[in-house]
Amino acid sequence: MDGRQVVRARRWCATAAVALMTASTVAACGSDSGEIVISYYTPANEAATFTAVAQRCNAELGGRFRIEQRSLPREADAQRLQLARRLTGNDRSLDVMALDVVWTAEFAEAGWALPLSEDPAGLAEADATTNTLPGPLETAKWNGELYAAPITTNTQLLWYRADLMDEPPATWDEMLSEAARLHAQGGPSWIAVQGKQYEGLVVWFNTLLESAGGQVLSDDGQRVTLTDTPEHRAATVKALEIIKAVATAPGADPSITQTDENTARLALEQGRAALEVNWPYVLPSLLENAIKGGVGFLPLNENPALRGSINDVGTFAPTDEQFDLALNASKEVFGFARYPGVRPDEPARVTLGGLNLAVASTTRHKAEAFEAVRCLRNEENQRLTSIEGGLPAVRTSLYDDPQFQAKYPQYEIIRDQLINAAVRPATPVYQAMSTRMSATLAPISQIDPERTADELAEQVQQAIDGKGLIP
């Protein structure tokens, strides 16, 4: 998302927070009047956004039922655990769930999420598949059937110091060459990545693997495909070679084995990295910190026209004119581009993130829950979620909307990458598999591509078979 989005989101969410507190206050008594209340569980991080969208739907529903946002923890693992406990405990108050895109298979296989084909109105499948980007839609499927409908999505981009290079690198080989050139000149030479033992490392590996022509599992999620054919093995080894090369390159970040999204963002802002792969929030973060004087190569704090753009709580809250001024100034030293590819002249297949809406199998109000999902992700609410809330849209048509385009300077890249996206392996045991993969990949500086390829295949197979202890 761009800086103007974040600004609008902050202004808007301050108002929406009042609505959120109101919703929490009435939660205990909502059903006492006999009205139907559809619970809507979402991550706490975006509670204000999803509360405001729910209230818009309530205004449209005319009192037939009410959607009530309820917050899950901020961390994905804790969200999953809370939902799993509620579902295994047959919590009948659980209706609509915002699921991380990697949970679809697990929740479907466990019988926790209803297939969209069970919508009594018969509208859920058509709504999910119409005007929805193919990448996000793929994450909502298990065994060829839809169990959820996408509501938000995300994709990583390449961020780079435009004042240090003529053009952004198009491949990882070019990334390494550019970093080597900068190191030889004594300039910033880090490639900022997500290299510590966690899910972000699995995302990086999966993007490289799919971009090299490989994949972790077969499409049905039953067979490990990391080393099963010479072509697949070559793709796995190539992905591992890139990770190892980035970690051990001359002038590389000495703490690269402990890096995540936040350290990557700061490495570029603080002038130590010249190249970074990360999510779209990088741009608004850079502009805000530059206004505060924290970005040495972009001293926006020295521009008198930008005075007053930091509000009383210390966040970037510019006028539209101030935002345009800051954005245009940043273009002289900072840029964004497509995520670097593995093969020359072939675009990367970037692993996507986001949330899907699923109806819980424990719901007592199936028809209303499916109707709530349709309303929460309709085009107007997608516009609000994206432009005001700062969460990338899944509705294809919004990317052709001039208002949307004005708020997302990266919209073309985001759209193109979402159309040709990589998804993380679809399997009910994804959590165990991901944990094993990150443990095998770490520390990335010690990867032996051929040996690590075999170890990865073995660990993924053990996860599929449900054998052994998770590292």
From Swiss-Prot:
InterPro entries: Bact_solute-bd_prot1, SBP. Changing Q79A: About 10-fold increase in constant dissociation (Kd) value of trehalose compared to wild-type. Alpha,alpha-trehalose binds at N45, E46, Q79, D100, N154, Y198, W279, Y281, G354, R424. Changing D100A: Structurally unstable. Pfam families: SBP_bac_1. Residues 1-28 form the signal peptide. A lipid is attached at C29 (N-palmitoyl cysteine). A lipid is attached at C29 (S-diacylglycerol cysteine). Keywords: Cell inner membrane, Cell membrane, Disulfide bond, Lipoprotein, Membrane, Palmitate, Signal, Sugar transport, Transport. Belongs to the bacterial solute-binding protein 1 family. Monomer. The complex is composed of two ATP-binding proteins (SugC), two transmembrane proteins (SugA and SugB) and a solute-binding protein (LpqY). This is Trehalose-binding lipoprotein LpqY. It comes from Mycolicibacterium thermoresistibile (strain ATCC 19527 / DSM 44167 / CIP 105390 / JCM 6362 / NCTC 10409 / 316) (Mycobacterium thermoresistibile). The lineage of its organism: Bacteria, Bacillati, Actinomycetota, Actinomycetes, Mycobacteriales. The gene is lpqY.
